[in-house]
Amino acid sequence: MLVYLVLCALGEVASWFPISTTVAGHAQRCCDPALGFTLGWIYWLKFIVITPNQLTAAALVASYWVDAETLNPGIWFTIFLTFILSGYKIVVVLGLLILSLVLALGGGPDHERKGFRYWKNQGAFAGEQTPIGRLRAICRTMPSATFTYSGSELIGVTILHSHNPRRGAARAIQLTFYRILVLNLVGTVLLGMLVPYNLDDLANTSRDKVTTASTFVVAVQGAHAAVLLHFLNASLLLFVLSSANQALWVATRILHGLAVDHNAPAILLQTGSTGTPIVALGGCAVLSSLAYLNISGDSRTLFDQFINMSTMFSLLAWISILVTHLAFIRARRAQRVPDKALAFKAPLGAFGSAIALVFCVLIIVSRSFDIVDPGASIRRFDYIAFLTSYLAIPLYVCLIAGYKGFTRCASVSPSEADLGYPNHFFSSRP
């Protein structure tokens, strides 16, 4: 629901402005130039962290074949960065969903119909007996759950490049919502049917190669479908490599856009003969080499740290999008822009964005429940998790305060927001 509300808020604003306007540009026009500046950089940081995160995930998947002690993860990254992979992901995931359903119904080599036995025998909160323990269990899943949906707001790019923004916004949001519903939620349900929570292969606490495998690989192995294991692991490896490639592309585009808007050094504007922003791409690629930290550290630990950072950047980006939408609504009302002039209108309007803002704040606060464990015999404080989870917040505040202090800019008044009305941006578009 949170993701849907964010998508609707973005869809309403993005479908109003012209193609050349970015998400950061929306914030500059409707809310505050400092927020637009900050959103651009936070958005770039989010995707520049996702790239090494996905490369780290690739190392974890590849460790199923060759342990890190035998072949250093740094070797894998040198190989992976030579690939440009995309387009196959939907086919792979749909195949995994069908395979999982067949295995759950007893169609695997073991002919064991698992059904919902793990939902009944162990349950959703197995091992947690107290309300506080169950709350902590929910909070513990928030970073990875939020990370799963991060990037959903990229539909804004689709809307901005649509010839018919009214139709394009609604269709893009619907397709994204259905993708989340089918691929993410259905996949989670099926995995819950196939894999018990306390399976040793999921612990990832030893150096046995099975513990570094994907949950889907563990599910297939549990059904004794050995012939599919290596093929499935290879498919998942290509999956995360494609995600890393996409994140690198988005980060490069955002960084170049920041330079175009004079919010980043002008050297980033340099392009090659084909129009590729080579300096921005090179800078992002260099930062992606953070994945080589696996050479001196545990891949699983580093993977979790990247998720913590990316999750917080995503939440801050969502908060900025929602604040921009609320400012856009205030500006429309102040300038008396009728609803019928909108290319797309968020179904729940300002109320939906306000509710989504509350949920974003709650998710941010909930992270502290897992960082500090007051119920342990020895009070545990994971300072690394704290830093990687919350470092983005002071950075976010410093970017806003620094931009305001340097430029002396003021927040945009609703009556003075540049909405371009009554000369509607799309009045001349087909």
Indicate residue ranges for each PLM-predicted region:
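Helix-loop-helix junctions that connect adjacent transmembrane segments
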Residues: 87-226
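Transmembrane helix-loop boundary segments of multi-pass membrane transporters
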Residues: 65-86, 231-234, 293-321, 373-390
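Hydrophobic transmembrane alpha-helices that form the core helical bundles
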Residues: 3-80, 244-254, 316
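Membrane-helix boundary/coupling elements in multi-pass transport proteins
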Residues: 19-20, 42-56, 144, 149-162, ...
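Transmembrane alpha-helical segments of multi-pass small-molecule transport proteins
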Residues: 65-82, 90-96, 113-114, 280-289, ...
